[in-house]
């Protein structure tokens, strides 16, 4: 379980499932120890150290709380210790500082005569970005399992996993001047042949994380990204057969319109959408090959 919890019902369910829990606070440790004792078992846990994410975990200076788990909580078996890196995709100096702070806690744990178990800090970005850095006992791969990383890495050897697939449900010609999508965002300069595909943002296409950071430098970065997309005419596309075709106008909730003027295709032809599986709606049928 990769998050800490002090909620009794969650802890009971996890223990019944024989799961390994995360302990990231004194409250969680006390709750887990008590419930495990009541259930007449020992809970296996990994202790989370917060070196910068600010979510779950003991801060490096809270070692008394960490040592209390080993000393005063007999129903807890510590089998691991970890931290999570918040900028491994770009800020190497900051990342190495986080790793050093984490390793200091691990070293102090051992100096006090306690065994931290499996030690791990590396996420997908750290695995591919921190070449030459000792990665301890294990790595926690997330986005790399989908063949995607948070930074450009030409030699990762990864292949994208997962795509959305639908079929062409409508083919028609639009006259010059006709518009496509909400707001009429696309206007045809000439007569064009279009295909309508019954798949849109409600299924996970053309969705992205909200820009939720309010630092000035992030705002500048977002503006520059938008300018680049505008100047380079970067567009969304889908794949029909072995050809990429551009999306026209705004993607709708349930539909996407594409330009097939120069493509030989027919109703019912398969259409592939390149998309991260992380954004695909739970309502979409999944097939594993």
Task: Locate predicted features.
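Active-site-proximal beta-alpha core segment in soluble small-molecule metabolic enzymes
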Residues: 1-120
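Active-site anion/phosphate-binding pocket segments in diverse small-molecule metabolic enzymes
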Residues: 99-289
């Amino acid at each position: 379980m990769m998050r800490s919890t002090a909620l009794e019902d969650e802890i009971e369910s996890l223990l019944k499932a024989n799961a390994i829990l995360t302990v990231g606070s004194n409250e969680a440790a006390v709750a887990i120890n008590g419930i495990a004792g009541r259930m007449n078992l020992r809970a296996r846990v990994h202790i989370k150290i917060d070196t910068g994410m600010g979510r779950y975990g003991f801060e490096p200076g809270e070692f008394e709380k960490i040592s209390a788990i080993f000393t005063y909580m007999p129903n807890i078996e510590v089998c691991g210790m970890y931290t999570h890196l918040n900028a491994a995709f770009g800020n190497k100096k900051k990342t190495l500082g986080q790793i050093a702070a984490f390793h200091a806690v691990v070293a102090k744990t051992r100096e006090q005569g306690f065994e931290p178990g499996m030690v791990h800090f590396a996420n997908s970005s750290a695995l591919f970005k921190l070449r030459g850095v000792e990665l301890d006992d294990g790595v926690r791969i997330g986005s790399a399992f989908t063949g995607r990383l948070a930074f450009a890495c030409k030699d990762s050897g990864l292949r994208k996993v997962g795509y959305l697939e639908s079929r062409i449900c409508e083919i028609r010609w639009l006259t010059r001047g006709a518009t496509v999508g909400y707001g009429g965002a696309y206007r045809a300069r000439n007569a064009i042949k279009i295909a309508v595909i019954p798949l849109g943002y409600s299924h996970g296409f053309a969705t992205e994380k909200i820009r939720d950071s309010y630092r000035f430098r992030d705002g500048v970065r977002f503006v520059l990204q938008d300018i680049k997309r505008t100047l380079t005419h970067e567009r969304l596309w889908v794949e029909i057969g072995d050809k990429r075709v551009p999306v026209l106008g705004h993607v709708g909730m349930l539909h996407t319109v594409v330009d097939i003027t120069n493509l030989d295709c027919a109703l019912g032809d398969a259409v592939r959408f390149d998309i991260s599986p992380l954004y695909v709606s739970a309502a979409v049928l999944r097939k594993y090959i």
